[in-house]
């Protein structure tokens, strides 16, 4: 059996209990060495075989899974954050399906959640934004037509941009082609929840210059939107006038 497990954003204690239990139990761990905190490997059994997928191709990763299955051994495929976001897990699952190998998924805390925690921020503030766009800038890997950053920026919603910090000049230009202005709040979160975490608060207008001045070139998220400003509306749910299934308010 193969278990796809989300490692969380960085801090080892942010992996789920289920994920930690699987790491302690399996015969083999294949981990994304470029992003997963190696401290998590300390949970593995002494006889656990460990592979760093940063040095492997899809075919090599799949071959290890297949060999383990033939030997009646269980494997954890350990991905950073939550595997459902930029985890490249579908192509692995398709191979396992073709070979008749069973697998399951254990979710993890995504780095975009870790970034919000680092900023003490709420992405969906009443009266500000009720939509979160998770995307990335097109680079060596293209994006589908209609999903270019400038087009998505036209919504003016809260935006979380993965895998794009090395293209920060292009990111800033694309954001300014949309609904954001030079005064729109933004932030860069480097290695959210890791000991070396860094926070950079800025505006869309100063995003590129401040990021470059800070020397941040990889392993960082860009977040944009007025959720980072001071203004918002009080929630209806906890308003004394608002009636819910569990509480009668002053208004029906």
Region locations from a protein language model:
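Non-catalytic, surface-exposed connector residues within folded enzymatic/regulatory domains
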Residues: 16-17, 34, 126-128, 183, ...
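Short secondary-structure boundary/capping segments
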Residues: 20, 42, 67, 124-125, ...
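Short beta-strand/turn micro-motifs composed of small residues
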Residues: 31-33, 79, 136, 163, ...
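Class I S-adenosyl-L-methionine
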Residues: 1-109, 114, 208
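Residue-level signal for well-ordered alpha-helical positions
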Residues: 42-43, 118, 174
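A contiguous loop/helix-start segment that scaffolds small-molecule binding in enzyme catalytic cores
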Residues: 2, 60, 71-75, 131, ...
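Class I SAM-dependent methyltransferase SAM-binding "motif I" and its flanking Rossmann-like core
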Residues: 84-155, 198-201
